[in-house]
């Protein structure tokens, strides 16, 4: 079971005007704006991977062929915000909505994001369960932690200042040391 990103539902945690000011670029240097606008989501994705946290809200879909035996389904989506939809999908792809009440978010949506399943769920009987959740900071979720916003700024600034200086390391997207330290301090640990 892998959560599928269905839709980005919010804005980037750092906008283009904020990054232009952070990089001390004047408003007449519009040639760089397109590059910076493309670097923002890339830097966010790199910081998200390092911190194991979602910095932008999104909607995800999970499809199950069986209800979890212990009534618990860990998800790699932190922070988990809400269960949006629950349904049963038959062989023809028709979705029958069910009350999402028996499916809820676990007690720690940051460090142990999971779904809890109540005992009163209908049997699947050859159908699949479809569950949509929202996850990520911003929007309806909690605010992005300030150290991760700074890590995003530092990452983007490092990439912007050192563009074209890869020294043969094609595809290197390593975080600058200061940004990596900030992301590590906020990292969600796994056992």
What are these regions (language model features)?
Residues 1-191:
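Divalent metal-cofactor coordination and adjacent catalytic microenvironments
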